[in-house]
């Protein structure tokens, strides 16, 4: 079993897969922009108890795998990250402003999936069989 994270009251292992898309899928993410976006993540994430595991990008979106704590308010973190990274990326890479729609860098929407652990059906079966006598 993987090493679990813990705090004073619980033990947990919570992985997430986040996909953030550039507004209108504008093709503006290159290696330097992705690397800077990752650096910004590294600055903001610890304040929310988030640990980066993996980061990768395509020209119009990024994929991020991270761990979080049970108390982490994920939507607040994601919105804070998108706001700060949008502002900084547009300031530091002014050439991308020409390709964006108005001032928005990221789409308002995002995709957030849980990851890791046992498959849902295995957990469902485990819960359903609790309390049954074994022969």
Describe each PLM feature range.
Residues 1-135:
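Basic nucleic-acid-binding interfaces
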């Amino acid at each position: 079993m993987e090493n679990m994270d813990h705090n004073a009251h619980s033990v947990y292992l919570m992985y997430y897969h986040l996909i953030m898309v550039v507004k209108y899928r504008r093709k503006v993410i290159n290696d330097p922009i992705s690397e800077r976006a990752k650096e910004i993540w590294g600055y903001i994430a610890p304040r929310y108890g988030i640990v980066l595991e993996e980061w990768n990008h395509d020209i119009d979106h990024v994929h991020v795998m991270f761990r979080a704590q049970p108390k982490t308010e994920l939507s607040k973190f994601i919105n804070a990250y998108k706001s700060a990274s949008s502002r900084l990326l547009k300031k530091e890479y002014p050439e991308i402003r020409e390709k964006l729609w108005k001032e928005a860098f990221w789409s308002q929407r995002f995709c957030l999936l849980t990851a890791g652990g046992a498959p849902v059906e295995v957990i469902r079966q485990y819960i359903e069989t609790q309390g049954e006598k074994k022969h």
